[in-house]
A protein has these predicted regions:
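A substrate-binding/cap region within the structured catalytic cores of diverse enzymes
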Residues: 1-69
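N-terminal start-of-chain detector that recognizes signal peptides
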Residues: 47-48, 75-78
Length: 138
């Protein structure tokens, strides 16, 4: 509710569990569009921005945690929301560990699985294409 400011009031121990503060926020239009599309009754533009900033803190924290634990190879599994279009976690990971070789994989659901639809191209480095009637877990 209070943006990033109240995070500074967390105890030193609590701050160990999040990305370093102050967080250099990077706008993610995809995230903002997603939150706007939720059409929450009575929501204001500031509410969407706060939700996007909360999401950025999550992504930055995941990026920071990965950066602190990288060995020769590191696999991190997350929903595409956190890494589509090289944004989200990737943005912050590149800040915390510049020069890393990062590859993203996205699962795509389509009617026809023999060829990727053009609208999904460039969202990830690799794709796993599954039929639309495949069981989901969300």
């Amino acid at each position: 509710r209070g943006g990033f400011g109240p995070l500074e009031q967390l105890s030193a121990e609590a701050k160990n569990y999040i990305a370093p503060l102050p967080l250099n926020y990077v706008r993610n239009e995809g995230v903002e569009t997603y939150f706007r599309s939720m059409e929450m009754p009575g929501a204001k533009k500031e509410d969407t921005e706060k939700l996007a900033k909360a999401q950025a803190l999550k992504d930055a924290t995941m990026g920071w945690s990965i950066a602190q634990n990288i060995g020769s190879y590191f696999v991190h599994l997350n929903g595409s929301f956190h890494s589509a279009n090289q944004a989200g976690i990737i943005t912050y990971l590149n800040r915390y560990r510049p020069g890393l070789k990062i590859a993203t994989v996205e699962v795509v659901r389509q009617e026809k699985t023999d060829k990727l639809d053009k609208d999904v191209m460039r969202k990830a480095d690799f794709y796993i294409c599954v039929p639309t009637d495949m069981t989901t877990t969300y």
